[in-house]
């Protein structure tokens, strides 16, 4: 297969995956116990992300206090060595980060039970160490893991995934080379349902193809959810074993 051949006649992608295969997915929680109430580190393909959750805690300013629910903040820090697509205009990059933060806040405000934490603030800090496509989905997954580690109540997992459309073939969990060559969508899927908490369309996709793209994305997100659940269960078992050994 040619080095720049996105999808070969044999059905292989640039990294050797089939159209419906996920990238390598590794995650761990409670990675920064002294720096945050909840934390996670995850690698999805070449995406490497640290997520810290601080709170619920009392806000510094009374103006930030809501007597009926918690205030949720998200900050995204893109490291200079993360392969972030940088334009000559720093304003464009800043606007892109602001859009990501706004989308994440809106999504998790609907999934976190903020009403049971009135008069508090929950700060989510994300540090992107390296990225290689599908970054929004990876951010979603990192936040979900860190919130659960912090013991913050949510209605369900939210799992993120990207899907590209190459000609008429959907490609699951796209990397950056694939994203640059085709239209992509990012999904945030609630639990094992087909309910979407996020649908981000990066480019035009024919309506007659969209239903298939979404179905494949939802199925892929369910697999990501299972991988996150597996990590959480392993961590819980480890904690129980350590407690029993004392």
UniProtKB/Swiss-Prot annotation:
Q: Where in the cell is it found?
A: Cytoplasm; Nucleus, Nucleolus
Q: Which family does it belong to?
A: Belongs to the RNase PH family.
Q: Name one GO cellular component term.
A: nucleus
Name of this protein: Exosome complex component SKI6
InterPro entries, A to Z:
ExoRNase_PH_dom1 (IPR001247), ExoRNase_PH_dom2 (IPR015847), ExoRNase_PH_dom2_sf (IPR036345), PNPase/RNase_PH_dom_sf (IPR027408), Ribosomal_Su5_D2-typ_SF (IPR020568), RNase_PH (IPR050080)
- Pfam families linked: RNase_PH, RNase_PH_C
Keyword Cytoplasm found: yes
Q: What else is known?
A: Present with 5150 molecules/cell in log phase SD medium.
From the broadest rank down, the organism's phylogenetic lineage runs: Eukaryota, Fungi, Dikarya, Ascomycota, Saccharomycotina
Which PANTHER family would you find in this protein's record? EXOSOME COMPLEX COMPONENT, EXOSOME COMPLEX COMPONENT RRP41
Q: What does this protein do?
A: Non-catalytic component of the RNA exosome complex which has 3'->5' exoribonuclease activity and participates in a multitude of cellular RNA processing and degradation events. In the nucleus, the RNA exosome complex is involved in proper maturation of stable RNA species such as rRNA, snRNA and snoRNA, in the elimination of RNA processing by-products and non-coding 'pervasive' transcripts, such as antisense RNA species and cryptic unstable transcripts (CUTs), and of mRNAs with processing defects, thereby limiting or excluding their export to the cytoplasm.
Q: Give the disulfide map.
A: none
Q: Which Gene3D superfamilies match?
A: GHMP Kinase, N-terminal domain
């Amino acid at each position: 297969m040619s080095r720049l051949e996105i999808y070969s006649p044999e059905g292989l992608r640039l990294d050797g995956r089939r159209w419906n295969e996920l990238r390598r997915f590794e995650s761990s929680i409670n990675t920064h116990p002294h720096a945050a109430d909840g934390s996670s580190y995850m690698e999805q393909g070449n995406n490497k992300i640290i997520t810290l959750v601080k709170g619920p805690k009392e806000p510094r300013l009374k103006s930030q206090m809501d007597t009926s629910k918690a205030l949720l903040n998200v900050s995204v820090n893109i490291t200079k060595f993360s392969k972030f697509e940088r334009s000559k205009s720093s304003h464009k990059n800043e606007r892109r980060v602001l859009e990501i933060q706004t989308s994440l806040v809106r999504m998790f405000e609907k999934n976190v039970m903020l009403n049971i934490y009135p008069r508090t603030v929950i700060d989510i800090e994300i540090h992107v160490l390296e990225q290689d496509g599908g970054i929004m989905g990876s951010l979603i997954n990192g936040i979900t893991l860190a919130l659960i580690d912090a013991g913050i109540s949510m209605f369900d997992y939210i799992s993120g995934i990207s899907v590209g459309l190459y000609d008429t073939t959907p490609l699951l969990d796209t990397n950056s080379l694939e994203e640059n060559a085709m239209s992509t969508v990012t999904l945030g899927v609630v639990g094992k349902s087909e309910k979407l908490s996020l649908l981000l369309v990066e480019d035009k996709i024919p309506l007659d193809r969209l239903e298939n793209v979404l179905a494949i994305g939802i199925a892929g997100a369910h697999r990501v959810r299972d991988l996150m659940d597996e990590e959480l269960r392993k961590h819980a078992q480890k904690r129980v074993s350590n407690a029993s050994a004392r």
